[in-house]
Amino acid sequence: SDVYKRQGGKTIDELSNKTVTNNPALSLAIQDVVMNNLLNMDTTLILSYDYKLRNFSAYAQQLEMESLGKSVDRDTGELLAYQTGSIVWGGYGPRSQHSFFQHLFQGTKDANTYFLVSKTDHLNYKQFKGQTKSLISGNEAEPDSHKKVNKRKFTSILLEDLSAETLGQLIAIWENKTIFMSMFWNINPFDQWGVELGKINTKKEIE
């Protein structure tokens, strides 16, 4: 596809292999591990504010949960004493106004939250700014407790455009971030034996 013909993914791969100080994938991996293991945020919420990115959360869900849903040390084979991959969920931001956002603004559980936005989608960009401003400021002065909105931590990834090259960079960042997280937790991101067992038992039922 056009995405992989461009140099976007290659650029991020080269950064991930050569540098520590200017490595977006590594920075996000460290952040996600801190959120998961130190701040006990066991879910990752991904909200996109460009229609072309409306399915990105589903891609990230498959990538991260299949790769990082492990509980065994890759070297010793022993069960790990710490948490690994989080539950990944999300969707297209404008469609999430009355579902995810109610939970995000007033729920009791916090999530490691990402906003993905492109400046080229002007209406969605304005909505993104409005929503994130609400999360930054909250409304603690509100006298009615049932109307109060929580302040939340979140990460914004702002894309200048949504070209094939930029999309390739975003995909490469997520793939490299996932690899780095598997290294921090010392798990094997390349096997899916839980999935395989399901296939085997399903085949037995069919036969």
Where are these regions (language model features)?
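Solvent-exposed, flexible loop/coil residues
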Residues: 60, 72, 91-92, 108, ...
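Short alpha-helices
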Residues: 1-11, 149-193, 197
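Glycine-centered secondary-structure boundary/capping sites
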Residues: 40, 107, 117, 138, ...
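Active-site phosphate/pyrophosphate-binding segments
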Residues: 1-114, 119-124, 197-207
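Membrane-targeting and insertion segments and their boundary/processing signals
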Residues: 27-34, 38, 144, 164, ...
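Short, conserved catalytic or adaptor-binding loops enriched in Gly and charged residues
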Residues: 77-81, 145-150
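Generic preference for well-ordered secondary structure
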Residues: 40, 44, 48, 84, ...
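Acidic, Ser/Thr-rich peripheral helices and adjacent loops at domain boundaries
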Residues: 122-146
